[in-house]
Amino acid sequence: MTKEIPKINNEYLKEKRKKQRIQQRRVQRMIVGILVVIVLLILVYMFTPISHIKSADIKGNHYVSKQDILKELDIQNHPRIYAYSSDDAETRLKQNELIDEVTIEKGLFNPIEVNVKEHTIIAITTEKSRVVPMIENGKVLKDYKQEVPNEAPYIEGFKGAEKRNLIDALQKMDRTTRAQISEIVSAPQKDQPHLIKLFMRDGIEVVGNTNTIAEKLKYYPSMSQALEKDETGKLKKSGFIDLSVGATFIPYDNVNNGQTSSASAKEVQSGTASEDKAKDDLQKALNKIKDEESSE
């Protein structure tokens, strides 16, 4: 017995194909609509102020001013982001000797982001009668023409190995410590070739050794506070702090009277009660700090 073949409903197939065509046209219209919108958005972005660079978010600069960075970015005419060459801008910025590294990141909209990594100014010196900065690797920026920040010590009289020793010491200090020093002068003696004089910004003179000054100067704020001062902040008993060996306060009277031959490690003989108290307070302050550090 032969199996009967089912009849195909032509009307049903026609209706199904019709619905499929309608659905396909809807999808096609949707795709075309989306493409049109995308093209319009691109045109709006490219030919309206939306794509203009109007500002820059600058981070990491300390010595180099924002105005100097903006000048090298060259965005005052509001260039369009997609046409702006960040590589060229980075090259211009790196011509500043205080800038070590710089990266410029662009998004679809402004501002652009500028990340600056600067060299650290560890000292100020004189080159051909011009005050110029010295950076962390010991390089003197001889052609530096901008204003030198007044937050690093001025150094004088250092050459050769002793200059290298001083640079090493300054590298070990943090920015806050260096900023407390106004000037450093080389003052070698026969028995102490590494002796230096530091003139602090609070008016106190410090004598030290280039090999140990970085470690000892960390305690300077407490040393300074331990010394008795008048209402104007000046020392009641003028003198200097000797850090060449240990920590000692030496009144200038002792030096003038010949009680100490130099700013050396020699202990000062007992003076007046106020002198002894100043020395004791200074030594106690240093001992206290060292005890606290060792207990951490």
UniProtKB/Swiss-Prot annotation:
It is a single-pass type II membrane protein. Gene3D superfamilies: 3.40.50.10960, membrane protein fhac (3.10.20.310). Its main location: membrane. Residues 51-119 form the POTRA domain. The keyword Iron does not apply. Residues 274-296 have a biased composition (Basic and acidic residues). Residues 256-273 have a biased composition (Polar residues). HAMAP family: DivIB (MF_00912). Cell division protein that may be involved in stabilizing or promoting the assembly of the division complex. This is Cell division protein DivIB. It comes from Staphylococcus pseudintermedius (strain HKU10-03). The gene is divIB.
